[in-house]
Amino acid sequence: MATIEGTFVNSSSLRVAIVIARFNDLITNKLLSGCMDCLSRHGIDVSESSNQLDIAWVPGSFELPIISQKLARNGNYDVVITLGAVIRGDTPHFDVVVSEASKGIATVSRETGVPIIFGVLTTDTMQQALERAGIKNNLGWSYALQALEMGSLMKAVN
C-alpha cells in the first residue's frame, strides 16, 4: 500500500496565483499578508518581479470563481488561492454570496484539476473576521499551507 502525501519541504518549483476580493479589504489585505508570509517562508518568491506568484484582484467574493477558473485553465499555475471575507448583514445577501462563491470555487477545482484553495472567511461580525485575519491568528497563513500541500500532492500523484 502506498501512502501519498504533500510536503512543504521543496515548494520552490510551484507556481501560485492568489485571487483576492477588494470588498472588506481591511480583512482581505490582512489575509494576503499572512498568505505571502507563509509562501515566502516556504521558498516561494513573493517579490514584485516574481515568476512564481501572481495576484489578481476582483471586486468581491462572488467574482472569485470566474477569475480562478480563467487562471486555472491557462496552465500557468499549480494551485490557486482565493481570499475573501463575507460578513453577515441584515439581508439574505450573505447567504447568496457565500453559497455561490463556495460552490463556484469547488466546481472550478473539479473541472480544471487545479487545486483551488477556499480562503473565504464567512463570519457573523467584523470582530470575528478580524480575529481570523490577524488578531489571534491569520488564516491567510493556513490557506497558503493548504496550497503548498495540495500543489506538492498533485505533483506526487502525477
From Swiss-Prot:
GO terms for molecular function: 6,7-dimethyl-8-ribityllumazine synthase activity. It catalyses: (2S)-2-hydroxy-3-oxobutyl phosphate + 5-amino-6-(D-ribitylamino)uracil = 6,7-dimethyl-8-(1-D-ribityl)lumazine + phosphate + 2 H2O + H(+). One of its GO terms (biological process) is riboflavin biosynthetic process. The active site is at 93 (proton donor). The keyword Transferase applies. Signal peptide: none annotated. Keywords: Riboflavin biosynthesis, Transferase. The keyword Transferase applies. Its EC number is 2.5.1.78. (2S)-2-hydroxy-3-oxobutyl phosphate binds at residues 90-91, 132. 5-amino-6-(D-ribitylamino)uracil binds at residues 23, 61-63, 85-87, 118. Pathway: Cofactor biosynthesis; riboflavin biosynthesis; riboflavin from 2-hydroxy-3-oxobutyl phosphate and 5-amino-6-(D-ribitylamino)uracil: step 1/2. GO terms for cellular component: cytosol; riboflavin synthase complex. Belongs to the DMRL synthase family. Catalyzes the formation of 6,7-dimethyl-8-ribityllumazine by condensation of 5-amino-6-(D-ribitylamino)uracil with 3,4-dihydroxy-2-butanone 4-phosphate. This is the penultimate step in the biosynthesis of riboflavin. NCBIfam families: lumazine-synth. This is 6,7-dimethyl-8-ribityllumazine synthase. It comes from Prochlorococcus marinus (strain NATL2A).
